[in-house]
UniProtKB/Swiss-Prot annotation:
GO biological process, alphabetically ordered: glucose metabolic process; pentose-phosphate shunt, oxidative branch
Family classification: Belongs to the glucose-6-phosphate dehydrogenase family.
Task of the protein: Catalyzes the oxidation of glucose 6-phosphate to 6-phosphogluconolactone.
Annotated binding of substrate, by residue: H180, K184, E218, D237, K342
Listed GO CC annotations: cytosol
HAMAP family per the UniProt record, alphabetical: G6PD
Chain positions recorded as NADP(+) binding sites: R46, K150
Claim: Transcription is one of the keywords in the record: no
Protein name: Glucose-6-phosphate 1-dehydrogenase
Length: 494
């Protein structure tokens, strides 16, 4: 199914996200025939470029990042245009009116437009107001949608303020708050796994699940983003958005139907059901960390405080581990252990569902644990671990696995996260985009952690290349549990 004819306006078109993610995603959608031929992309930034210069820059980015053919590349780039605008000056937005009028006429888009704010967060409240000053937000002539990148706010208060600013000029149905984790195939498949298989859903509750682990690990440090990262930290960069959204997908109730309202209703219910964090939780169920210099694979890697752009006395966390609970009928008493960090041993995001053991150990006190491992990235996969008899005499149980890898699906056309989400936005499907009530509930949940850190809460050190502070191991060990150390789930079929 192709999209409506439309014009895609990218604010921040000279930035890294546009070059690495947005234009490649649009190119691939075009290449596989998912975009209508009647579409245009208008790049907007302060840089003084013209259409041809912009096309050449995007062409270079595509050749560098994607598999291209000259014919498809030329055809796609012919849809790219550019307009220099001072994005902080409302009057300058008047330049967009004749450009968009021309593009709507040329591509017969009926006025359909979506705006992508690939800009610093400081402009998230400015751009909608400036668009509205020239009538570019109204839906009298075609639909108008606006995509907001994370972070949506800096804390609970600023998120509320930003919401008010945007809602002055765009209605909720026009606003698409993007979280690229929700565009990943395995996250979506989690819902199908749960709600289309009769053998999982009856077990998906406090009666059969012992605890849940969610890990979002990055092997790199802050790279060249030290200045930006120091203002966000692991809490704002990963935990409040990506990992809480994944947690909600694991814990949500079955929606009445698969559409934007029903799905997002259930996500919001989970966010509102998270047990509020107390001062006792700050001491017993939370670990914040910061990586220090260490040798990794024979190379000495910098500690966080030595990274470019990071103040020497920074208390920004590069690691967080939290034990949280959901106060509802399904999950009462089941701990969710969530962790994320930079400079860990591997880049991996996965969910581990730990099922309870049998009531009585018939075969062995050390029988294998039943686990369902859902790998979100890299190498998207699902693995079920359980016990079977070890060959030979006796009845010793041995762990075996049943595995599924997306890469093994012959001919599978798996869209990247940005491809899927851009396609959904053009179709008007907001199912995988965050809604305002869930965003505010997530900020409300994490606000005590932000306050704890601001008031001098402890930041534990951990060596780069390790799985985080020792305190994080002690946190989960309090209940006799250990963090799974992610490794390759399964070997590739040959």
């Amino acid at each position: 199914m192709q999209t409506d004819n439309n014009c895609i306006v990218i604010f921040g078109a000279s930035g890294d996200l546009t070059h690495r993610k947005l234009i490649p995603a649009l190119y691939n959608l075009y290449k596989i025939g998912r975009l209508s031929e009647n579409f245009s992309v208008l790049g907007v930034a302060r840089s003084d470029l013209n259409d041809e210069t912009f096309r050449e820059k995007m062409r270079e980015a595509l050749i560098h990042n994607e598999e291209t053919t000259p014919e498809t590349l030329d055809a796609f780039c012919s849809h790219l245009y550019y307009q220099a605008v001072n994005t902080s000056d409302a009057q300058d937005y008047g330049k967009l009116v004749p450009r968009l009028d021309d593009l709507h006429d040329k591509y017969q888009t009926c006025g359909n437009t979506f705006y992508y704010m690939s800009t610093p967060p400081s402009l998230y409240g400015v751009i909608p107001e400036c668009l509205a000053a020239h009538g570019l937000n109204t839906e009298e002539y075609g639909w108008k949608r606006i995509i907001v990148e994370k972070p949506f706010g800096y804390d609970e208060k600023t998120a509320q303020t930003l919401d008010v600013q945007i809602h002055r000029f765009f209605e909720e149905h026009q606003i698409y708050r993007i979280d690229h984790y929700l565009g990943k195939e395995t996250v979506q498949n989690l819902l199908v796994l749960r709600f289309s298989n009769g053998w999982f859903e009856p077990l998906w509750n406090r009666n059969f699940i012992d605890y849940v682990e969610i890990t979002g690990a990055e092997s790199i440090g802050v790279e060249e983003r030290g200045g930006y990262y120091d203002g966000s930290g692991a809490m704002r960069d990963m935990f409040q958005n990506h990992l809480l959204q994944v947690l909600a997908m694991v814990a949500m109730e079955p929606p009445a139907i698969i559409n934007a309202n029903s799905m997002r209703d259930e996500v919001a219910k989970v966010m509102h059901s998270l047990r509020p964090l107390t001062s006792e939780d700050m001491e017993n169920n939370l670990v914040l960390g910061q990586y220090t210099a260490a040798e990794i694979n024979g190379k000495m890697e910098k500690g966080y405080l030595e990274e470019k752009g990071v103040p020497a006395n920074s208390r920004t966390e590069t690691y967080i581990a939290l034990r949280c609970e959901i106060e509802n009928w399904r999950w009462a008493g089941v701990p969710f252990y969530v962790r994320t960090g930079k400079r860990l041993p591997a880049r991996v995001t996965e969910i581990v569902i730990h099922f309870k053991t049998t009531p009585h150990p018939v075969f062995s006190q050390n029988a294998p644990e039943n686990k369902l491992i859902i790998r979100i990235q890299p190498d998207e996969a699902i693995s079920m671990r359980f016990g079977l008899k070890k060959p030979g005499a006796g009845f010793e149980a041995k762990e075996v696995s049943m595995d599924f890898r997306y890469a093994d699906l012959a001919g599978a056309q798996v869209l990247t996260a940005y491809e899927r989400l851009l396609l959904d936005a053009m179709k008007g499907d907001a199912t995988l985009f965050a809604r305002t009530d869930a965003v505010h509930a997530a900020w409300k949940f994490v606000q005590p952690i932000l306050d704890y850190k601001a008031n001098g809460g402890r930041i534990h050190e951990y060596e780069a290349g390790t799985w985080g502070p020792v305190a994080a191991d002690k946190l989960i060990a309090k209940q006799g549990k250990v963090w799974r150390k992610p490794s390759g789930l399964m070997k590739k079929k040959v």
